[in-house]
Amino acid sequence: MNSKIFAVLLLLGLLSCVLSDQYCPKSSITACKKMNIRNDCCKDDDCTGGSWCCATPCGNFCKYPADRPGGKRAAGGKSCKTGYVY
C-alpha cells in the first residue's frame, strides 16, 4: 500500500516538473528584411519583469515565457549588440 502511494506521489511530482517548463514563445514572423533587424537584448539580464531574451527572425526581444516550446532563447555572446543590426 505504501509503495503505491509513493509511486503516485512520485508520478505527480515528475508530472508537475514537466508541466512547469517554460520556453520562449514561438515567433509569428518567419522572415525579416535586414534593415529591420534589431536587438532589444542580448541576454536575459537585459530584460526586466521576469521576461527572457528570445531570438526571432527580426532580432532579439524580451518576451514573457510560454508553456509550449517553439521559440528560441537568444545566444548572446560578445558579438551581440543592442540596436539595429545592419
UniProtKB/Swiss-Prot annotation:
Signal sequence, renumbered to the chain: 1-20
GO CC term (a single one): extracellular region
UniProt-annotated location(s): Secreted
Keyword terms: Antibiotic, Antimicrobial, Disulfide bond, Secreted, Signal, Toxin
Post-translational modification: Contains 5 disulfide bonds.
Protein family membership: Belongs to the venom protein 11 family. 01 (wap-1) subfamily.
Protein's job: Has antibacterial activity.
Protein name: U15-lycotoxin-Ls1g
Organism: Lycosa singoriensis
Lineage of source species: Eukaryota, Metazoa, Ecdysozoa, Arthropoda, Chelicerata
